[in-house]
Amino acid sequence: MIMVELEKRMDRPLPEDFVEEYRRRQAIELSRSVTCIPGAVELLKVVSRRKASICVASNAPRAKIDLNLQATDLEEFFQPSQIFSAYDVGKWKPDPTLFLHAAEQLGVAPKNCVVIEDSLAGIDAGIAAGMQTIGYAPTASQQPTDKVQFVHHLADLIPVLG
């Protein structure tokens, strides 16, 4: 859909390798600019020591998820079977399908899952999936509601999840 719009605006067809080249360049830029959220490594170490099932469930394509994990040195915490993309299930947050699929694959009941989300769509998906949902907002702009609490530092989750 976006490519069709670009072709209309440019009044010419895009090169056949446009999407591939765009993704390649995006990957290079992403690997240069993405940084790890402060406290993420410490939190993942604590949760891993507990032997809790953990995963990544993202709206992004799998290749982008993998690239982000590599660029932030977090790939050591996740096996391929613990990484889920909305592209795998054909449904994107705020639809809860991705979270429900991840829970099923990990053998964990939704009511026993904790979702940590940095997007409103993800928060809505976690709530709709019947999972305890915690919003991550590095600024104090987001306040707790009756359905979700927010943390502003991942280290604040260590006592809760550790």
Outline where the language-model segments fall.
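Asp-based, Mg2+/Mn2+-dependent phosphohydrolase catalytic module
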Residues: 45, 61-162
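Short coil/turn segments at beta-strand junctions that form active-site/ligand-binding loops
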Residues: 51-53, 111-112
